[in-house]
């Protein structure tokens, strides 16, 4: 089993409801370690840059508005198969389809306000981590 790093974000719908600790505990309970974390309020420009891959999608404008509407918590997680573990504990994008006990089943309000984001591949993880963290901010 490979030790990996992945990117995780707790979105504004969850931070508004003071769920940062509960969600982080769910992540840590899978064996993942938080090796970097900070609370940020994304500017519109930061949200557009972070979600640039979705620029041509019909939901892009709504996504940017939502992500810049309140604080988020950005984190780097580390552990065995961290990307897969993080995605499993997050649950399906649509909370209606998420398995019981996953973050989205427990905490998400809707498909748009689904509480968390996580990298889907090693390449994406590397890019997303570098977007928010310098090497000196990641302390394993």
UniProtKB/Swiss-Prot annotation:
Known EC number: 2.7.4.6
One Gene Ontology term, aspect cellular component: cytoplasm
Keyword Calcium: no
Cofactor(s) this protein requires: Mg(2+)
Localization terms from the record: Cytoplasm
EC class (word): transferase
GO molecular function: ATP binding; metal ion binding; nucleoside diphosphate kinase activity
Family matches, as HAMAP family: NDP_kinase
Similarity comment text for this entry: Belongs to the NDK family.
Protein task: Major role in the synthesis of nucleoside triphosphates other than ATP. The ATP gamma phosphate is transferred to the NDP beta phosphate via a ping-pong mechanism, using a phosphorylated active-site intermediate.
Assembly and binders: Homotetramer.
Protein name: Nucleoside diphosphate kinase
Species the sequence originates in: Bartonella bacilliformis (strain ATCC 35685 / KC583 / Herrer 020/F12,63)
Originating gene: ndk
